[in-house]
Design a protein with these regions (language model features):
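Short, acidic/polar
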Residues: 77-91, 141-155, 209-215, 299-303
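Short Fe-S-cluster ligation motifs
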Residues: 391-430, 459-463
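Active-site groove signature of glycoside hydrolases
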Residues: 156-175
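Conserved, mostly hydrophobic/aromatic
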Residues: 50, 62, 99, 114, ...
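Twin-arginine (Tat) signal peptide motif
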Residues: 6-13, 367, 425-431
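Beta/alpha (TIM)-barrel catalytic core signal, keyed to glycine-rich beta->alpha loops juxtaposed to Asp/Glu
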Residues: 169-381, 388-408, 439-445
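N-terminal binding-site loop/beta-alpha segment at the start of enzyme catalytic domains
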Residues: 2-126, 187-188, 194
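Structural preference for beta-strand elements that scaffold enzyme active sites
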Residues: 57-61, 98, 125-129, 160-163, ...
Length: 463
């Protein structure tokens, strides 16, 4: 039974201003920050036409992996449903109609929280995207896939899903066949698509060009044999840094995008901000970007870059705060695409940024929970923030060493509780063997490196 009444657009127009007061965040040392571009009311976001359905999809999509959390009476983490409703109301009133979730997001709570917020509106007025998250080899079965789809339909309170994805294709083609083809899962999903339970079928991609080319060959073979496409869309990581300067073992985004464009597949963009890192770039890079366009936020550069490619249908953003939502709505209402001169400028900024020793963590939390209590994303986020702000000294001979040492240690203890810090890591490797980090980070190795660095800082502090 739906626990909230349906609202019309007219009933909630203007509610967003009140919602912003309900959204707060605690600033802890080197925690991420982000600026808003304007206090004026945004307009309606730009849309693009889906080539298969002909329907208009908002170019700005809502990523539902980072809904705000709160505590219940027993101190347990739960999604702040009231705030989620306010965010969805404000986004929907400005034309955002694409909402992306997954069974594993927020410890399995995201799908239903998203559905509760959206269930107050006519089902045909928005698009739902969710995923088959069969990461563990024990889940490579048709029974698991069928049950997960059934659970998603139930959690989302719907009898169809607009965009369904094979979640995180991040290995070789043989692994893809093992996960989805040889066990009958792909045939089952194609059958569900033919029945209308799934309106579009695609996959999210985290591997290299060779694997993507093999997938596209597989796609074309199916299309030749059946007369219809195997896949309707692909989700990929696309941003101005990864375009030519991928910070991990994945291929450059430009090359992956070119393959998809050649095959005519629409692209859904994930990580346009690299987990927030492109809205919090090193100071001297931020200064140049602000000088180039004083009225634009750093985040708006990233979103406009991602959306300035003609084959991109939708750009996702995990907007957990009203100020971020408003800023993004300004960017997309209407979308002003970047010209070549602005793209060249971002390429120069990417070259500068590539010289920084950052860890390519996007805070997806696929590595969590750690069996030994580490807050892996928080440790990496803090480290990257301090690198950007110049608080990571190369040696004790650095003239700023004492100041930097204090800034790093004080902010570290504020950002990450002692019982969750890097020195708790025992290199059990559960975070890499069970979670399949999309960024291919050698998490235990990085934890040892950070732990050693912090130990040196603390030792020198006592001398």
């Amino acid at each position: 039974m739906r626990i909230m009444e349906k609202l019309t657009r007219r009933q909630f127009l203007g509610r967003g201003a009140a919602a912003s007061a309900a959204l707060g965040a605690v600033s802890l040392g080197c925690s991420p920050k982000r600026e808003s571009a304007s206090d004026s009311e945004p307009g309606q976001v730009s849309c693009r036409r889906d080539p298969k359905s002909g329907q208009e999809v908002s170019v700005l999509g809502y990523g539902c992996m980072r809904w705000p959390m709160t505590k219940d009476a027993q101190g347990k983490d739960i999604i702040d449903q009231e705030t989620v409703n306010e965010l969805v109301d404000y986004a929907f009133s400005h034309g955002v109609n694409y909402f992306d979730t997954a069974p594993i997001y927020l410890q399995g709570l995201s799908e239903h929280a998203t559905a509760l917020a959206l269930s107050r509106y006519p089902r045909e007025s928005y698009f739902l995207a969710t995923k088959l998250s069969n990461f563990n080899p024990n889940s490579y079965t048709l029974e698991f896939a069928s049950a997960m789809l059934s659970d998603s339909l139930s959690n989302l309170m719907t009898d169809y899903i607009d965009y369904y994805l094979l979640h995180s294709v991040n290995s070789d083609f043989e692994n893809f066949r093992t996960r989805f083809v040889d066990n009958g899962i792909l045939d089952y999903l194609l059958e569900q698509r033919s029945k209308g339970v799934l309106r579009h079928l695609g996959f999210s991609f985290h591997s290299n060009c060779a694997v993507l080319s093999q997938l596209m060959d597989f796609h074309e073979e199916y299309k030749t044999r059946t007369g219809e496409p195997l896949f309707d869309f692909v989700m990929m990581q696309l941003n101005w840094f990864d375009w030519h300067h991928s910070g991990n073992s994945n291929a450059y985004a430009a090359d992956l995008y070119a393959i998809l464009e050649a095959h005519g597949l629409p692209v859904m963009v994930m990580e346009p901000l690299l987990g927030g890192r492109l809205s919090d770039v090193p100071d001297h890079i931020a200064e140049q970007m602000k000088e180039k366009e004083p009225g634009r936020s750093l985040a708006s550069w990233a979103f406009r870059f991602a959306a300035s490619h003609k084959n991109v249908l939708c750009v996702l953003s995990g907007m957990s705060r009203m100020e971020h939502l408003r800023d993004n709505l300004h960017t997309f209402s209407p979308l002003v695409e970047l010209d070549e001169q602005h793209k060249d400028f971002l390429e120069r900024m990417a070259e500068l940024m590539s010289s920084y020793p950052l860890i390519p963590c996007n805070d997806c939390k696929y590595c969590m929970p750690c069996p030994y209590g580490l807050d892996i994303p928080a440790i990496f986020t803090h480290y990257n923030k301090c690198v950007n702000e110049g608080y990571v000294s190369a040696s004790a001979q650095d003239p700023e060493y004492r100041k930097n040492r204090r800034a790093y240690l004080v902010s570290y203890d504020r950002a990450v509780p002692r019982q969750s810090q890097a020195d708790r890591c025992i290199s059990c490797a559960r975070c890499v063997t069970d979670s399949h980090c999309p960024q291919h980070i050698a998490i235990p190795r990085e934890m040892m490196r950070i732990s050693k660095y912090i130990e040196e800082l603390r030792r020198s502090n006592s001398m």
